[in-house]
Amino acid sequence: PLNWNIAPTNPIYIVRANDPFGKDIKGEKALATVSWGLIGPWLTEMQEARASQSRAINARSESIHEKPTFRNAFRSTRCLIPASGYYEWATALGQYRPKQPFYISARDGLQLPIAGIWSSWTAPSGEVIATASIITQEAQGELETIHSRMPVFMPADRWDLWLNPRNTDVNELKSLMVVEQPESIVIARPVSDAVNSVANNGKELTVEAPLGEPET
């Protein structure tokens, strides 16, 4: 079923290389379901892993190749996260009231392909749990008036290079994550505070709502 208000650790879809170990030279892709928020590979206890997962829903493009939680996945198991859109809460002082929610979606009405990384973690029970994180960068253009960060939107002509597990050149991978002029890709509209509760879930959450007054 469609989920219009995804919370950390909820299931999300990813597109990944069909053969994450790089033996398939055809570059075929596979759709998979994972849990949102990467689990650090060194963790051994479920409670600790879930707590860590909630803190790792996003990975910064500037440091992803260095952070212990993310660096191995960045080098070998990258993915695309297809999304109808995403919510962001205003932090820019003076322009919008604090925590004014916005829904940001593709201008063409299609799916937004967001850059991500994924990994598998084995729980103490032996269960293998696949998890993923969204990659973010400094906000650009109009999105900068809402929040200081934004997802890395991955153009179609970069998908094959991004998903190829044999592509381990850090500089090339970092160059793929550079996105400028996001306003040509996405459009933002203010929405109701109803999205603040994960108990609310429906397409109506994405309907444009009047802007709240900024605090003075």
What kind of feature is each model-predicted range?
Residues 1-78, 105-109, 115:
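Short, His- and charge-rich active-site/binding loops that engage polyanionic ligands
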Residues 60-64, 129-137:
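Short, structured beta-strand/loop micro-motifs enriched in basic residues and often containing a Trp
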Residues 86-88, 110, 120-121, 141, ...:
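Short, catalytically relevant binding-site loops at active-site mouths
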Residues 90-97, 163:
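Cytochrome P450 core scaffold surrounding the K-helix E-X-X-R motif
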Residues 95-108:
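Short, surface-exposed polybasic-and-hydrophobic patches located at secondary-structure transitions
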Residues 105-125, 132:
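A motif-centric signal for short, conserved binding hotspots located
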Residues 135-216:
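C-terminal accessory segment of soluble enzyme catalytic cores
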